[in-house]
Amino acid sequence: MNTKSVKDIWKAIEFGEWRKPTSGLAPGYTQANVVILPKKDAFDFLLFCYRNEKPCPIVDICEPGQVAPPVAGPDADIRVHVPKYRIYRHGELDKEVDDIKSYFTEDMVTFLIGCSFTFEKELLEKGVPVRHMEEGKNVPMYVTNRQCQSAGIFSGPLVVSMRPIPAHLVDKAVEITAPFRKAHGAPVHIGDPAELGIKDINKVDFGEPPNIKEGEIPVFWACGVTPQMALKNARPELVITHSPGYMFITSITDEEIARL
């Protein structure tokens, strides 16, 4: 699957042949978090992303009712090309579904937000291990004690993803990821999880628990699940997102996203 074209991957997702997390899928292409919400809430959400660019770097925005992201996937259909979606009603998770054709209306605005899965290929190619990819797991994600800047109806805490990195490679990991500004860039924290309010690193809020080996340091990047916490607080009537770890594969290459 990893060697297939992006269009082949979209088709596989649409027909139910891929229903797993997308870390490591389509190496060399940018992955994106998905937030779809009514037009009346779109400006407040846009402002929230602008004020919190580290966890919410915007890759693309659709017009109301538009299903093909004009920059990130002009041949895609956002309603069927994500492996798993979440449906939120009034801030509460209602269900997870495989497509959103029955929920998407002409009033819905789609936001694509950068994802740290994008820089994992670069880490691997330059000798920095990525544990969850080695083990075929979803990345560990945590809600922190850091608050984002509020905007309109949206407010909430920063969410981070974590990758255990051998101590001697931490500086290298920072250097590699920093240029990927549209994929969260450099880490927001290195070391003690307690400083982020994480009491037990083995108890994740999203994803799967980590396997941290001796001599490794937990390294935390801002995460595009952050908007889902803000959406829960804002309690809009209906919001659709990707399920954490099940991203939209864009047709933008890693080289292109690093230049944005």
Swiss-Prot record:
Question: Could you name the domain of life of the organism this protein comes from?
Answer: Bacteria
Residue spans making up a coiled coil are none
Cite the PANTHER family for this sequence. Answer: D-GLUTAMATE CYCLASE, MITOCHONDRIAL
Q: Which GO terms describe its molecular function?
A: D-glutamate cyclase activity
* Sequence similarity: Belongs to the D-glutamate cyclase family.
Q: Which species is listed as the source?
A: Alkaliphilus metalliredigens (strain QYMF)
Tell me one Pfam family matched here: D-Glu_cyclase
Q: What keywords are annotated for this sequence in UniProt?
A: Lyase
Name listed for the protein in its UniProt record: Putative hydro-lyase Amet_2975
Asked whether the UniProt record includes Lyase among its keywords, one would answer yes
One example of a Gene Ontology biological process annotation = glutamate metabolic process
Q: Which InterPro entries match?
A: D-Glu_cyclase, Putative_hydro-lyase, UPF0317
Stated EC number for the protein is: 4.2.1.-
